[in-house]
Amino acid sequence: MFKTNTIITDNITLNEFYNKCIKEKVLAVDTEFIRDNTYYPSLCLIQIAGENFAAAIDPLSGLEMQPIWDLLANEKILKVFHAARQDIEIFLHLTGEIPKPIYDTQIAAMFCGLGDQVGYEKLVSNFLDLSINKENQFTNWLQRPLTKNQIEYAISDVTHLIKIYPLILKLIKDLNREDWVQKETKYLTNKNLYIIDPLTAWEKIKIKQTNRETLNYLKYLASWREIECKKRNIPRNRLIRDDVLANIANLKPREIEKLKKIRGISNKLSIDDCYQIIETLKQSSKYNSDQWPHINKTYKKNNIDKCSLELLKLLLMYCSEKSGLAQKLIADTEDLRNVLHTPHKNHEIFIGWRNKVFGNYVRTLLDGKLAFSVENNKIKLIKF
C-alpha cells in the first residue's frame, strides 16, 4: 500500500501512486542523476509531489516505469520543475518526449527580481523561510540501499516545490508577467535544444585563434567523437580531450604512428579508433575551401569597441534593476556584441518583452539620443 514520503520499488505501489497523481491538477517533479562516467545522465531517482502526498520512485529497482511516463505526458496535469532543463533532457532521452505542460520556478524567479539562475536553496529561503540541509547534496545516488535521510532529502525537494508554486505564481500574476514566463518556458519544450548535431559539436570547443582549414578538420573530428561517445555512452573527454582533438586538427597526422606521438593521446585509444581518426582526417581534406567553416566570432575581439560594449552592459544593469528582471534573462554579453556588430538586425532583444524593458533603450542609445548621468549616487538616463 502506498504511504506518502516513501520510496517506491514495486509495481503495485507505483500503480497506486499513479492513481493518486492523475487526480491532481499540479505535480512537482524532480530527479536525481549521475553523469560522471556517461554521455547521457544516469537516472537514479524521480521525486513527485501532489498537494498532500509525495514519493520517490526508484527506476533502478526494476519497476515498469510506464505509469510515470504517462503522468509526464498527461497534458491535463501541470508539471512544476526547478531548473527543468536537465530533468527534461533525461526524460526526452528515455521516452523520446518532453513532459507537457511544464512550469519552471527558476525561470519564474528570474522575473521576480531574485537574480540570475536562482538556486533552489535561495528559492526555498525566500518563499518558505526555510533552510535546506546540505548533508546529502553530493550523494552517490546510484548506490543502494538509500538511507532514510537520503530519501527524505530527495523528497523534500518536491514537497517544498509544490508549496512554492502557488506563491511564485501569485507574484508573477501581480507583476502581470505570466505571458513572459510562459514564452521563456516554451523555449525549454523545443526538442532541438537537447539534440546535438554532431557537425556542430566543434563549436563548443574552446580553441585559440586558428584558420578555416584547421577548423574544417576539427569539425569532422568533433563529429566523429560525438557519434562515438553517444554510441558508447561515455563522456567526450573520456575518449579524447578537447585540447588533444584541436592538436590533431592542427597537426593533421596521416599515419597512426604519428598520431600516437601527439601529446595527450591516451593508451586506451584502440587501433580501430586511431584508424577512424586518420580516415576522418583524410575525408576532411577532400572538402574545398568554400566548404570550410567560417570564423564567425573574430569580430568579437577585434572589431567591437570596448567602450560601446561597456555602455551596453551598464544600460543592461540599469534596465535589470529598474524592471526587477535578471540580467541574464534579458541578454548576455554575446547578445550585446551581436547587436553592436549588426545593429540593424532584428535581434532577440528587439522582440516582445525584451524590447519593452531593454531593446527600446538600446536603439535610442545607438541612435545617439540617450545619455547617462549620475544623480544622488544613482544612474539616470537622459533622452534627447
Over which residues does each language-model region extend?
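Single-stranded nucleic-acid-binding OB-fold domains
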Residues: 33-40
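N-terminal accessory regions of nucleic-acid-interacting proteins
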Residues: 1-27, 31
